[in-house]
Amino acid sequence: MRHLRFLPQEIISSETGIEILEFVVNTLMGDDPEPPVQPFDPPTLHDLYDLEVDGPEDPNEGAVNGFFTDSMLLAADEGLDINPPPETLVTPGVVVESGRGGKKLPDLGAAEMDLRCYEEGFPPSDDEDGETEQSIHTAVNEGVKAASDVFKLDCPELPGHGCKSCEFHRNNTGMKELLCSLCYMRMHCHFIYSPVSDDESPSPDSTTSPPEIQAPAPANVCKPIPVKPKPGKRPAVDKLEDLLEGGDGPLDLSTRKLPRQ
């Protein structure tokens, strides 16, 4: 009962004791009493920030604002020390002091600021300056020349040599072995458009089906003799010509079998 230590040395009434016991029990059991309901919510900082106060006009407001400049008001808010302007020292008894000291606020009057940089770096050497200007002139000339040149398709006698279109592509890409499309096709046409035979012109004789045999076959050509197949195995042969000589039995193209041991 540490709460009773702060009570005066008087007799406690029954009602006060009951209230104290209920408070102790609720505190120990974790059942805190609900906070009292407030009739209205207190204003927040956002409400106070946008709050507009309409008060009576002060006839001395203009004189006070003219006496204390903006720099002095800012110095008072920031706790800085500022030298008062000469006109504020005319009134006796007014002294602008700062108990914090050590800091001074710069003059907040209007001033023109020059943001131009007047510093100069190291001057370039004569060699570097000349090389840079020369490279710039060369690049400009090449760009003007490339823009002024118009692409023209050329067909020289030898593909890839003396061709204006090939030179145009070589200058733009930097590849000396580049060819234009026409020179490439003329140079490699035999790989793509090579004829199948010497004469591909259609003739009325070649279109007939089946074709007619005009020239007789030579007499010394060995022709195979058709043989009716018979049952049984054909004898093995040593060479292909033996098959063309014919025979009583059918041809045997099987290999010879070795006798079993």
Curated annotation (Swiss-Prot):
Chain span(s) of sequence motif PXDLS motif, CTBP-binding: 250-254
Biased composition annotated in UniProt, kind: Low complexity: 203-212
Span list, region Interaction with RB1 in competition with E2F1: 43-51
GO cellular component: host cell nucleus
Localization in the cell: Host nucleus
UniProt subunit comment: Interacts with host UBE2I; this interaction interferes with polySUMOylation. Interacts with host RB1; this interaction induces the aberrant dissociation of RB1-E2F1 complex thereby disrupting the activity of RB1 and activating E2F1-regulated genes. Interacts with host ATF7; the interaction enhances ATF7-mediated viral transactivation activity which requires the zinc binding domains of both proteins.
Protein name: Early E1A protein
Natural source organism: Human adenovirus B serotype 7 (HAdV-7)
Native organism taxonomy: Viruses, Varidnaviria, Bamfordvirae, Preplasmiviricota, Tectiliviricetes
